[in-house]
Amino acid sequence: MDVVYKVYQRFFAQVDAVYVKASRTSSIHLSFERHIDHFFDWHIRRRISSALTLGEVLHELELDFLIPDLQEIGLHEDELLCADNAPQMKELLYAHREKILDSYAQERCAAQKYYRAQIAEAKHVCFVDLGWKGSTFSSLEYFLKETCQMDVQISSALLGTEGHAFVDEKIDCGKIDSYIFSSQANADIMRIHNRNGNIWRRIYEIIFTANERSLLRFCLDEQGEPDFVWLRDEVRDPHIIDAMQQGILDFAHDYTQIERRLGVDLVIAARDAYRPLFRILHETDYNLRLFQEFEVCFIAGNVSRQRAEMFKDVVMKGGK
């Protein structure tokens, strides 16, 4: 959401804002104590079709210390992860919950120091993200309020949500605001999005990506101060990213200039805001020419370049 932050700071900054670092992997780690099933869904279930051995999965997740424990549940590190043994891997997570929590202790400490410094004395924090299930927001809400015991109201502004009951509950109580679509507003757009989600979500992610490296997780430096562990350099064209960001900034500049000239605030309705994006999403050939060599891996964790999924591969597989 780097470009959204740039637009806000340049043209709309009425409330103090900072570009807070977060990642799906880190948020999953930080909420592991409460959400082990969520950890399993993102880290293990999504790797079932990846032709990895159990040992390779645990190594990729930096949980090598659990490899000797596979024998306890009748598994071997050289077995391929599959739908049949995945439930036993979930058992492994629950059985060694405390050991895993201990391995994340430094990360929790670093994240707590980082977020306390960023949030400071603020009493209401709104995390801005794309979507789609609000899981990163929910994980950070748990971490900040339950683990860090911070007295802060937390909400999230998303582009769209995908109609899950727990997301609807957070919309009902005002914790999540979904601008373009949800099960409660513009549900027809949500249904179209959900049908095309595997490809469309990746296009959204590319449009709103940045040229800086992505955060993997937090750590402490030698002085005990919060630091960051970054993902390896992802495959993507920095010139295309710069051009997309400049186009977004140019539009925001022209739009706010018109508002000032007319002396009115021109609020863009959700459907109108979505219309050009909706058209772009349907231009598969155009998107393929632009983004075919963009890495779009949707598996959390430090995935090797050899296993990285490219946009062209997703399109060729029909988004599966």
Regions found by a protein language model. Give the residues of each.
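Long, low-complexity, Lys/Arg-enriched
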Residues: 1-320
